[in-house]
Amino acid sequence: MFTVALAKGALLQESVSMFSDVGLDFSAVLDDSNRQLMVPSACGRAKALLVRNSDVPVYVSYGQAQLGIVGFDVLQEQKLQVSNLVDLGFGECHMSVAVKSSSGYLSASDLPPNCRVASKFTNCAKHFFDQIDLPVQLVHLSGSVELGPITGMAEAIVDLVATGRTLRDNGLVEIEELFKSSARLVGHPLSLRLDKGPLQEIIDSIQIQSQTNLLSDGKK
């Protein structure tokens, strides 16, 4: 039996659906009455750990889960030792720099040196601003980073954007995209090397299923 780390929140429904498509039923985690954090699949071949999105790579990197599904943004932020196996094509969004729409800034390079930038993704932000050779003061926030520019605490934010509605509703505008993100199937490198077949079988099935889904979406 192998273990899969599933992220609570926005990716959970489609993650469960993806595993269901390849024969692993973890639908019990979607039951509102469920309080178990470790749930076996109906077939008994695997079990799922229900964890926070940011904890998925941690469980996988330590080998407590052999597979997991997590956003690419989390992988970029944490840089843990996990294998990025398959782009699953859902949970799509992008990481962007945003400012107040009234600021007049048109790109990240327009920001003044040593200005404050608020973000939940400070490692991603640091890497980006280092690349464009702009020194900034990073302010780590755990949520509602839009309040940084609104309150005047920060000149800009670095955050995930899906539809952009939250930014618009709060008078903010994107000025630069760092990278695109989507859900990824990740694996524990050593477990993959020692695998006698079961893990690779699931990985191959998920890769085929994700490609089928992408083709199907493209025809709609």
From Swiss-Prot:
This is ATP phosphoribosyltransferase. One of its GO terms (molecular function) is ATP binding. One of its GO terms (biological process) is L-histidine biosynthetic process. It is found in: Cytoplasm. Pathway: Amino-acid biosynthesis; L-histidine biosynthesis; L-histidine from 5-phospho-alpha-D-ribose 1-diphosphate: step 1/9. Heteromultimer composed of HisG and HisZ subunits. NCBIfam families: hisG. The gene is hisG. Lacks the C-terminal regulatory region which is replaced by HisZ. Its EC number is 2.4.2.17.
